[in-house]
Regions:
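General small-molecule cofactor/ligand-binding pocket signal
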Residues: 42-44, 131, 221
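Catalytic-core regions of hydrolytic enzymes
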Residues: 2-112
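Extracellular adhesion/carbohydrate-binding repeat motifs centered on closely spaced tryptophans
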Residues: 206-250
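Active-site-adjacent mobile loop/cap segments within catalytic or ligand-binding domains
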Residues: 80-85, 129-205
Length: 250
């Protein structure tokens, strides 16, 4: 879930717009995960349009409602942070706290978040750990205070582990220069997120039997049953990507 959109803009500083960075991170994460089997990846947005168009609630709650409709195993929301203290830097995980309500959700968000953070740290990003925040005026059915952040709270209510990854601070020049400035830097963040997800769920790389076919000048990968394969395919030790809609080699 790439956070924000053109209508609901995120943080902005040092020439960086959060909604743009989030989208690049999300796409990179999706593309890397598509190399693996036993996983179906959905992305809440592929452009900067508002998610209200899905008719699943407002832009924020539509993200959780989509995950619920898809019976998702988890929802990972990509963000970058901002703070008035321009020296503050590092990544942070916003996860469900141990409220005792739908306990599986808090346990999973914390374990999955730890796996993702470990891979972000390998890029040199400082870890600010977990941030747990609650509401004073809303409670879960067991009487415990509800989680503050909508993505996290709705995940608890829907029994779908939902967490937010803050990849660093747009207000910090060093974080911007090292992690947000270029497309390759943003891709690295998305790949790190994907590796954390892969490690947590113990996913295996795809190895599809089949071969290349050229039809009307366009190259496809066709499996043994004659199906054109989209996404990433490994052939003779090399990875090839085929358009997710047309299945044509990119």
């Amino acid at each position: 879930d790439p956070g924000h959109c053109k209508s609901h803009k995120g943080a902005k500083a040092n020439g960086i717009k959060e909604e743009d960075v989030n989208l690049d991170i999300g796409k990179a994460c999706r593309n890397y995960l598509n190399k693996y089997s036993d996983v179906t990846v959905y992305i809440t947005r592929t452009n900067n349009k508002c998610l209200k168009r899905l008719k699943l609630g407002d832009c924020l709650t539509a993200r959780n409602h989509l995950a619920k409709r898809l019976s998702a195993d988890s929802l990972v929301s990509f963000h970058i942070n901002w703070d008035p203290d321009k020296k503050r830097s590092g990544a942070m995980i916003l996860a469900a706290y141990n409220s005792g309500y739908n306990k599986y959700v808090s346990t999973t968000t914390q374990a999955l978040g730890s796996s993702i953070m470990a891979n972000l740290q390998e890029l040199g990003i400082k870890s600010e750990g977990f941030w747990f925040r609650t509401l004073d005026d809303e409670k879960y059915k067991n009487g415990a205070k509800a989680d503050y952040y909508s993505i996290v709270r709705e995940g608890v209510l829907n029994k779908i582990p939902s967490l937010i990854i803050e990849h660093g601070y747009v207000s910090n020049k060093s974080d911007c220069n090292n992690y947000f400035k270029t497309a390759e830097q943003r891709k690295s963040l998305g790949v790190a997120d994907a590796k954390g997800i892969i490690n947590y769920y113990k996913l295996s790389a795809k190895n599809i039997e089949g071969d290349f076919q050229t039809i009307s000048g366009k190259t496809y990968f066709v499996d043994k049953e004659g199906n054109k394969i989209a996404g990433w395919v490994k052939k003779d030790g090399k990875w090839y990507h085929f358009n997710n809609k047309t299945a044509v080699m990119n």
